[in-house]
Amino acid sequence: TWWDAVDVIASSGYYPIDDWDNQLDRIEKVVKKFQKPFLFSEAGCMNIHGSAQVPNNWELQGEEDDAEQADWYRAMFTACRKRDWVKGFGIWDWPGNLEGLSPYAVCGRPAENVIAEEYGRRE
C-alpha cells in the first residue's frame, strides 16, 4: 500500500494556543492506525498580539508581543510532551540572516529561550 512506503507522518502545526490537545487527539488516530513516527515539519507563531489564536494568519497586523509568541511555544511543547509519538518540530522561522527578522522569527526573542529550554529537556 501507499502507507507501506511512508517513513514518517508529518504535518504543519499552526494551531490556536488553546486547541493543541484537540488537534493532537485528531492526529493521534492516524499515527496509531499506521504506526509511523510523527513530526511537525513546520510550526510557529508570530510575535504579533492576537497571533496565538490564529498562528497560521501571516497577514495579521498589530503590536509586537514577544510574550504571546513565547506563550504559544510553551503551550505547544507542553501539549506535545504528553504524546510520546511526537518526535520533533521544524521551527518557523529560523533564518540564516538575522537582519530584518520576520514576525515569525524567534531569534533573540523570548520564544528562543522557550525552545532552548525544551530541547535541553530532551536526551
Language-model segments: which ranges?
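Aromatic- and acid-rich polysaccharide-binding/catalytic face
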Residues: 1-22, 26-28, 36-37, 41-49, ...
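A general structural detector for well-ordered alpha-helical segments in enzyme core domains, enriched
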Residues: 2-5, 23-30, 72, 76, ...
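A short helix->loop->beta-strand "cap" motif at the edges of active sites that frequently abuts
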Residues: 34-36, 86
